[in-house]
Amino acid sequence: MREPGSERVQTWLAAQDAKACAISDWVFTEFSSALSIKLRNGQLAEAHRATALANFTMLATQRFAVLPVERQHFRAAARFADQHALGLRSGDALHLAVCADQGATLCTLDRRMAQAAKALGLMTEVP
């Protein structure tokens, strides 16, 4: 299942140091949700969903540092979401809160999220 920008992201990831990249525990929820939506909409077969989920889980645990999502991240995400002009969805606000807490650079293909991150003073990279 190829998404727009998949090859560009794969090339970018391959060039990164093995443990220099991190994701939060929230990414597991978002990935599972995205696969379930595609399954419900008929864009993905159950067997492909299971394979994609297994591959993602293996990649995520072997290639990335996994950051916990804690109470303070939800509170910070709410403060970010309160800034209505940023146009943040709750999940994106949570990603940004974890990035802000860790002093991490956000890597995303979502231009709106990247703009919001910059407005909040976070470093961003768009592969």
Label every PLM stretch briefly.
Residues 23-29, 91-94:
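Aromatic- and histidine-enriched alpha-helix N-cap/loop-to-helix transition segments
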Residues 18-21, 65, 100-105:
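Short active-site oxyanion
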Residues 1-27, 38-54, 120:
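Short, well-structured N-terminal submotif of metal-dependent ribonuclease cores
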Residues 33-40, 101:
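Short glycine/serine- and small hydrophobic-enriched flexible loop segments
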Residues 26, 53-84:
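Acidic catalytic patch
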Residues 58, 94-96, 100-127:
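Acidic, PIN/NYN-like endoribonuclease modules and their adjacent C-terminal/linker elements
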